[in-house]
Design a protein with these regions (language model features):
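Residue register of alpha-helical TPR repeats
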Residues: 4, 44, 51, 64, ...
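Short coil/turn linkers that connect adjacent helices within long alpha-helical scaffolds
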Residues: 32-40, 72-80
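Tetratricopeptide repeat
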Residues: 22, 26-29, 62, 66-69
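"A position-specific structural signal for the A-helix of alpha-solenoid helical repeats
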Residues: 1, 8, 41, 48, ...
């Protein structure tokens, strides 16, 4: 439950333009996913942190996080998340993922 709460709160902060706080909570969400072995929201938390890092001007970290989220979505066959990541990565960083 904690990863879901952290993901949702990080998403709200991201949408409000509070990128540093959003990135920190998304990272906390990732840590909670790993700590408790609940990986369902791990790609989402990675995606939120990637978007926040982009808007904070940290393109290298953002790029790495988008790649991690993309491949995790592919592994778990989370197609909705995959499409979001492909769209954002292309729009923000000009990354073209191949299928």
């Amino acid at each position: 439950m904690l990863p879901l709460v952290l993901y949702n709160y990080a998403r709200v902060l991201d949408l409000c333009g509070r990128y540093e706080e959003g990135a920190a909570l998304a990272k906390e969400g990732q840590d909670a996913c790993i700590q408790y072995g609940h990986y369902r929201f791990l790609p989402n938390c990675l995606e939120i942190e990637a978007e926040c890092r982009h808007f904070m001007g940290d393109e290298e970290t953002s790029k790495e996080l988008y790649y991690q989220s993309y491949y995790l979505c592919k592994i778990i066959k989370y197609n909705v998340g995959l499409e979001v990541i492909k769209q954002e990565a292309k729009e923000y960083l000009n990354i073209q993922f191949e299928d």
